[in-house]
Amino acid sequence: MVAWLARVLRSFGPAFTGIGTALRSQPNLQIHLAATLAVTTLGLIQNLPAWKWGCLGLCIGLVWVAELLNTALEKLCDRITLEQDEQIRQVKDIAAGAVLIASAVAVFMAFMIFL
């Protein structure tokens, strides 16, 4: 049982390494971290009910997933070529659009929750 638990915990290592790498290299992710901390602090100050915490958690998670996937796609595209390529530009733009939509939904929900 202990060996299984240790193996499971070790399996999360690459995920945490990836998050750390993205945080160190992506200014937008640092902005999302600051926003996450600010919204969490505001929620604690306002003593939000559980359902509002659930909404905030979903929105925060959505933004983080979108930003991490965008970062991974950008790095993969840059690995393929650093030259101007129309299809790669489109892939990067689409991924950035996903982050924009996720962020807009999160901001809208934050206004609905805190106002």
Residue positions per predicted region:
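Hydrophobic alpha-helical transmembrane segments
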Residues: 1-75, 79-80, 84-86, 92, ...
